Every structure is written in structure tokens, then in C-alpha cells.
From Swiss-Prot:
Protein family per UniProt: Belongs to the ATG5 family.
Gene3D superfamilies: 3.10.20.620, Autophagy protein Apg5, helix rich domain (1.10.246.190), Phosphatidylinositol 3-kinase Catalytic Subunit, Chain A, domain 1 (3.10.20.90)
GO biological process: autophagy of mitochondrion; cellular response to nitrogen starvation; piecemeal microautophagy of the nucleus; protein transport
UniProt protein name: Autophagy protein 5
Gene, per the UniProt record: ATG5
Record flagged with keyword Kinase: no
Residue ranges, compositional bias (Polar residues): 258-275
Localization terms from the record: Preautophagosomal structure membrane
Region (Disordered): 107-133, 256-275
Composition skew (Basic and acidic residues), residue ranges: 123-133
Length: 333
């Protein structure tokens, strides 16, 4: 007997609780210890942002830093020498740069979204120095507190306004794409507006979902367009790493097909806009089929998304905290 389809809120919670094991080391150039400082190990939420870790990382590496005056907001992260954009959620960064194979088995996708590793509960001890045998291999990152890469990253500030404003602006943009106006986010109460950001910072699913439900219209076909961004990373063997971001407007449904004379075709009802139809429209050379990933596959939240999945349903349950559906293109084979 087939398992019942999880309610959207259950899938949302699984996505929200997905975590990635991290092993964060201090940049050797900034470390006063000859054989390097101990790494900081943590299972961190996919939907969260790396700068939230900076205060605890600054405290953890305090005795190892050459520059004892370095401030937490001066911190930035890199992977294999590539500065990581702090306004991207961790899950997106991982899908872009880690090189890990996305989940493809239908039987394990739900489990993967539920916990890339087991979700850490509020009362659990801080897992900054333990890696148990058999646990997933952590993603190895470096944290830096000097030599800010101004060409790649906007500087953070001591008050946290820069990252706050970047997040809220992204929420506003998603709201405008969905509704043709940013009225919903602009008319949020002051309490809900600050509560949204606080829920993201504290990884509070209950409060986040309550406020998100105000912003995102309920029921089918209530979106004017889907907030969708497609990320095209450079090939692994590329000499110069690069990232192309493609954004376009996609309504939740496709109008009935018309024949060459302009008369209605066989399809008289609008068809759902799917992952495959949107990718075929944007990147036909990579996605020549709307139903089968021939040359490339769409990756979201660490899993390969079915090409036939309706775009609106996917964004409702698997979008990131800012309301955007961020799909990474991964080559087949």
C-alpha cells in the first residue's frame, strides 16, 4: 500500500529541518598556532545563513587569532579559495560548490530533506568538537577575519543591518514577482516584519510559517509569477570558477496551445508550469526535453527535482526563506 502524500506543511518542515555538517577551520594565514587550530564542527540548517555563525566562530577561535582585535562582522567564508556569498543560504552554497551528488532515489528524497544529518534540538550540546564515525563527511570551509574580498563580497557591518536589508530586499522582490506588487510585505505589521527576520535568525519554523502564510497567497493559481532563479555553476575542471544566475517570469500555468492559424489546439485548459517546462524554455540546449533530464538535472535542497513537478507546488514547499526557488543545474553523468 502506497504511503500517503505528506501535507505541504510536513514537507515544509522537512525542508526547514534539513541540515548540513560543517567543518570550519580558521584561515592558516590568521592562525597563531603552528599546526592549526582545532576545527569547529556543527550541523547547520540548509535554509540559514553563514554570517549567523560568526559570533560563535570568533569566540571559538579567539585564542588562535593573530589579530586579537578582529571583530566577528569582519568574518567571511571560503571553499577551496572561492569566497562564499553571504546572502545565499547555506543549502544553495552547498549545492553549488560542494560537489556532492544530489539525492535521486524517490525512496530517500524525503529522508534527505528531513535531515541531511539529524536535526539538532535547542537543548542539544553545541557539537563543535565531535564527529562520530559513520556520520556524513562534513563540508570543509575556512573562515577569515581579515583581507576581505571586496571584489566579490559586500562588507558586513557591526549592527547586522547589511545582511538584514539584503534578506528583506530579496523577500520584497519575491513578493513583487508573485503578486505584481510588494504590497503584502510592505503592509506587514512592524511586529511581523521584525518577527520574520527573527524567525530566520533563530531558525523558528512555527513563527516563520505563520508570517510566511501572510505573504504567500493560499490556494492554486494565486501567483502571478513564480519567484524562480536558475544557477549555472562553472564546470568542475574550469580554470576560473564562475556562476551564472538566470531569472525570468514564469506564470503558474501555461495557456492552451494554439495551432498555426491561431485557432485553439487540442488543449483547451491551461497546463501547470513545471520544472521541466520552465527549464526547457530558459535553457533548451541543456534541457531539450520537458520531462526527462537528458543532459542536465535540476537540483533543489540537495535533491534532484522531478521535471514534471508543478512549479507552484514546489516553490510553496521547498522555496528558501526569502521566498525564492533556487534551482542549481547539475550536469548528468
Amino acid at each position: 500500500m502506497a504511503s500517503p502524500t505528506p501535507a505541504p506543511s510536513a514537507i515544509q518542515r522537512r525542508v526547514w529541518e534539513g541540515r548540513i555538517p560543517l567543518e570550519i577551520t580558521l584561515s592558516p594565514a590568521e592562525c597563531r598556532t603552528y599546526d592549526k587550530a582545532d576545527p569547529y564542527l556543527i550541523c547547520y540548517p540548509r535554509v540559514s545563513y553563514l554570517p549567523f555563525l560568526l559570533p560563535r566562530l570568533r569566540a571559538f577561535f579567539a585564542t588562535s587569532l593573530i589579530d586579537i582585535e578582529a571583530q566577528d562582522y569582519q568574518g567571511w567564508f571560503s571553499f577551496e579559495g572561492v569566497p562564499l556569498k553571504w546572502h545565499y543560504p547555506l543549502g544553495l552554497l552547498y549545492d553549488l560548490y560542494s560537489g556532492a551528488d544530489p539525492v535521486t532515489s524517490k525512496s530517500t528524497v524525503g529522508e534527505h530533506l528531513s535531515h541531511t544529518t539529524s536535526p539538532r534540538q535547542p537543548n542539544d550540546p553545541e557539537p563543535h568538537n565531535v564527529h562520530e564515525p559513520g556520520d556524513p563527511i562534513p563540508w570543509q570551509l575556512q573562515v577569515h577575519f581579515s583581507d576581505w574580498p571586496d571584489q566579490e563580497l559586500v562588507r558586513l557591518d557591526a549592527d547586522g543591518r547589511v545582511i538584514h536589508d539584503a534578506f528583506i530586499n530579496s523577500v520584497k522582490e519575491a513578493d513583487f514577482v508573485r503578486n505584481g506588487t510588494a504590497k503584502r510585505i510592505m503592509t506587514l505589521s512592524k511586529e511581523d516584519s521584525s518577527g520574520l527576520w527573527q524567525a530566520v535568525q533563530e531558525h523558528d519554523f512555527t513563527n516563520f510559517q505563520r508570517i510566511s502564510n501572510i505573504l504567500i497567497p493560499g490556494g492554486p493559481n494565486h501567483f502571478r509569477n513564480i519567484p524562480l532563479r536558475i544557477f549555472l555553476p562553472s564546470p568542475p575542471n574550469s580554470a576560473t570558477p564562475s556562476l551564472k544566475v538566470i531569472q525570468s517570469l514564469f506564470p503558474p500555468t501555461i495557456p492552451p496551445a494554439a495551432n498555426q492559424t491561431g485557432a485553439p489546439g487540442r488543449q483547451t485548459q491551461p497546463q501547470p508550469q513545471t520544472i521541466g517546462s520552465s527549464l526547457n524554455s530558459l535553457l533548451p540546449s541543456l534541457f531539450p526535453s520537458k520531462r526527462i533530464p537528458v543532459l542536465a538535472k535540476p537540483v533543489l535542497q540537495g535533491a534532484v527535482v522531478p521535471m514534471t513537478a508543478p512549479l507552484e507546488e514546489v516553490v510553496r514547499v521547498a522555496g528558501y526563506a526569502d521566498g525564492w526557488l533556487a534551482i542549481v543545474v547539475s550536469m548528468v553523468g
